Amino acid sequence: MYYFIVNPNSGSGRGLRVWQTIERIIARKHIEYEAYLTEGPEQAGAYAAAITESLRKQYESTAEEESGEKAETAEEHVMVIVGGDGTFSEILNGMDTDAPVAIGYVPVGVGNDLARSLRLSRSVNSRIHRILRAKKYRNLDYGIMTVDGADGEACHRRFIVSSGIGLDADICHREDSMMLKPLFGKLRLDRLSRFFARYHSCRSAVPSKGYIVLNGERRVEFNNIFFVSAMLLPYECGGMKIGREAGLGNGELSICVYSNSSRTELMNAIRRAAGGRRKIRGLRTYSCKEAKIHTEIPFLVHADGESGGNAMTDIQVSCVKGKIRMII
């Protein structure tokens, strides 16, 4: 059974056209499916929660009847996400990760850091046929970002690509809140909005003293932090290759700290990251399962490019190994 969760507005409205193409393909193949088209924020997560909770209960009930034997495997239920990184992240935060379901992904967004990192085809026909004829799977890690909420309670958010504090979060926030972004999207000038966001973020960036604590043991201090990114995959912020040492499903985060006193060097570093260059001066990388990050100056934070617009000084990140079964 296939469950399609579609964001029709993803990719500046391209999501609906992509879904119509997919619908014609699966209709020709007489495939049984259910489709859920989102109409607003957080609806994708709500759909994912309902689908996966139902599948888990169904699986547990059937397994009990069959004396603990597995009644169905994850491959028999596939939840297909049609949207961008934001839609995927929303579904990740809504779904029951213990449900017997595999994930198919048709990337339609603008940044597409997840698809870029996994080297997924941008061709709709290619992706949907790979999902329908699923042969290759990969168990992906996901991360958890923890921050203090307004009421003092800890707030948790899952991420599949990256989470961070500082410049990378500021770039994401600027691009998402840019008034001309919808127009740039319709004109297929998404790179222009990304360029403006990066440029203005670098121009206004202020470094901070701070430190990271790795696995609760090793503390490393810095004098000029511009950003700290916890990477599960190589790319973030619409194609910036920050997490060069990030492994796919290795159970560890790649903590990338950019510390440099020169704003000119910062701009060069962002340009090199956007160009996929191998070496970035001032960028230090550490591997760990969990980390605490502190900066003396409050910075914006993000998870998978989604920033709430609130500045903070402390975040915690951790990695959950191999829980997302993905059709590659």
Feature map (PLM): residue ranges:
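ATP/nucleoside-binding phosphotransfer catalytic cores, i.e., glycine-rich phosphate-binding loops
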Residues: 15, 214-216, 241-328
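Short glycine-/acidic-enriched loop or helix-start segments at secondary-structure transitions
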Residues: 15, 90-92, 115-116, 170, ...
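Short acidic/glycine-rich loop or secondary-structure boundary segments that cap or lie
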Residues: 168-171, 220-222, 235-239, 263-267
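Catalytic core of DAGKc-family lipid kinases
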Residues: 97-224
